[in-house]
């Protein structure tokens, strides 16, 4: 077996540049404050943009304007994306209305619901970063650890107000998130201008190097796999007995990101390893994250995710190390069953009699019209909202006596169609991609409406228009919209060209396979047409498209389209 300490035993200078940056950053302070105060440039210079990710902020520029600004000898049109930390996606209406106001003041590209059930504010200029983050404070919100080499925002599946089990699931997700947040004083120092001394013991869990890469934690309650639990570094699958949440099946090692030009880079499904009691979940997460902190690869950043640590050292080694730290082995996993990984749109009633409405939001984009509509509704009804990991929005806590009036009000505001959208649209995700994401190689969100229209037209030719198929579109292979768990996925390779993946599960528990590389829209539709035709005529009752492709062995013969770069 390889040395279980391949990196932390090495001198710092032998680790990758990001590790060295963290070590000299004074627990994520760097020179961010000085960069914010320099108004001669719209950017934060040097290494600080990497550190700002730990603060929930990405430095970007408008790629549509690069050539023009270069020709005019101007610096890029710098702007920032600010991501909030909202464990489980739960907000009250005052927080939402406050965010609406802040986004109108500071976010030129508006609000977007992410595939981890939080919000991003796009198009924030550098002088507006501090006022924005200071404006979040009285709302009880922040952005710390929404990005960076730490535990990203903890996701939690399903509406927490449907039952006591759902509510407890949300509370445990919140406790876990709070436990895994970095403790550095850098956030208050930089953003609230509250000077804090740098201490050696500032990060008792993370240490000065934090994690090798991001670490994603998710909670889910079957039969709905709405967070795609098998794509998480650490996943908790709720086990409910007579309405009580008694514990979790634990799964480890999931992850979506990959590089197309490296064979040792790949998506991976998380593996179920056993069962724990419900109350242990927060402490257990710290244990697992600690193993990744100590043994993750800190030399090759592209191999630093937890999935690669497990594959490098082996699952038996991990279970042995986990047992040593925990003091006892895991119990056997309990039986669970998933039915789908989408949201249940429309109306649902909780055990307490209250009603909740889930609204479809295209690619999670909360445009000006939707913000105005939601503002009008929340000023009259509702107390809380919830953001889903499928980029939708739930209006919760509607009393029975209000229900009819609320239905009328949603219709008056033009929101009622979002309760019953097109079935295919409701099962489709995309990432932001161009023009702001620096990693995007092709369009995604802006292209999705056109692609979806043509795909629906093709399905309609075979009588499948109302049959949902999970479809995901991303601008690069990094997997932000969890493409490798979809029945059909396109990941960007170059402008207008994508890799086509097929055969994932409708339940989110099987990886899709690379079927064709560098396909354009016409080739994509041409490849799918005969498969959809056979699916229409030969599928079994209730059989999903991905399952059909595997049963009929339609993915065994790859087309001639190049799979190489």
Task: Report the location of each language-model feature.
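Peripheral terminal and linker regions in Fe-S/redox and tRNA-modifying enzymes
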Residues: 1-565
